[in-house]
Regions:
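N-terminal, active-site-proximal structural segment of metallo-dependent hydrolase catalytic domains
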Residues: 1-47, 51, 57-63, 176
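Active-site-proximal beta-strand elements of phosphoester/diester hydrolases
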Residues: 1-9, 98-110, 142
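Active-site beta-strand/loop signature of hydrolases that rely on acidic residues for catalysis
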Residues: 7, 23-41, 101, 130-151, ...
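Metal-dependent phosphoesterases centered on the DNase I-like endonuclease/exonuclease/phosphatase
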Residues: 30, 51, 125-211, 215
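Structured beta-strand-rich core segments of catalytic domains in phosphoester-bond hydrolases
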Residues: 37, 42-109
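Conserved beta strand-loop-helix elements of the APE1-like EEP
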Residues: 60-75, 196, 204-226
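Active-site beta-strand termini and strand-to-loop segments that position acidic
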Residues: 70, 94-97, 221-222, 240, ...
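Surface-exposed cleft-lining segments at the edges of enzyme active sites
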Residues: 81-82, 107-123, 158-163
Length: 251
């Protein structure tokens, strides 16, 4: 199976930059997007052969997630059943016979870390949600996690130590996710690979210089380790300030 995750940074804009062509070329079994920035009815996306599931933020033009899947799931859940967290359309969970598929757009801690305290609460609650699912069956989760875990995961670690996405607090929360029994699939296959990123600022010609961050992930329950085949980051694909990431898994 081929699974894709892409923060499209506004789907309507991404559609004008080749989203549908890239979607067809990638031909994923499950395709997850984050930061759709849509309200219901604002786009009619014709994707033959796919079931579509959307979670919208209450606030217009903000956040939002979607999953497009060739196989109809057994059930669909929106959010994580905590009202404080479920206003921004950040999580969708599809249940399949053998696993749960979760996509997430993790809250950004923002300039001057204004939202870091909220982010810390989110991290604890989202991990608890994942572990609750895992009691039923294995979990695959993907999305823009808004954290570069280690220094190898961004071009300029020293100058970003106190910036959103690379604070000690955020990195420690992701370490806890891994310690709890999840695998960062890209690092599982490529533990020492440098210079591979999934997000670049639109400023300072960052993508041209490859001054990026790896903040988009596929993580899986330890019990799925033997089914992993490959993990890829599609740095060749444009259309957003993020590029798609991929997981190949035998399920």
């Amino acid at each position: 199976m081929k699974l894709i995750s892409w923060n499209v940074n506004g789907l309507r804009a991404c559609v004008t930059k080749g989203f549908k062509e890239r979607f067809q070329e990638l031909d994923a079994d499950i395709f997850c997007i984050q930061e759709s920035k849509l309200q219901e009815g604002q786009i009619d996306l014709d994707l033959p052969g796919y079931y579509q599931y959307w979670n919208y933020a209450v606030k217009k033009g903000y956040s939002g997630t979607a999953i497009f899947t060739k196989q109809e799931p057994l059930s669909v859940r929106y959010g994580i059943n905590i009202e404080e967290h479920d206003q921004e359309g950040r999580v969708i969970t599809l249940e399949y016979p053998e696993y749960f598929m979760v996509t997430v757009y993790t809250p950004n801690s923002q300039n001057e870390l204004a939202r870091l305290p909220y982010r810390m609460q989110w991290e604890d609650d989202f991990l608890a949600y994942l572990k609750g699912l895992e009691k039923e069956k294995p979990v695959i989760f993907c999305g823009d996690l808004n954290v570069a875990h280690k220094e190898i995961d961004l071009k300029n670690p020293k100058t970003n130590r106190k910036n959103a996405g690379f604070t000690d607090e955020e990195r420690e929360k992701f370490s806890k996710v891994l310690e709890s029994g999840f695998i960062d699939t890209f690092r599982y296959f490529y533990p020492d690979q440098e210079g591979i990123y999934s997000w670049w600022s639109y400023r300072f010609k960052a993508r041209e210089k490859n001054a990026g961050w790896r903040i988009d992930y596929f993580c899986v329950s330890e019990s799925l380790k033997d089914k992993l085949e490959d993990a890829k980051i599609h740095t060749e694909i444009f259309g957003s300030d993020h590029c798609p990431v991929e997981l190949d898994i035998c399920l």
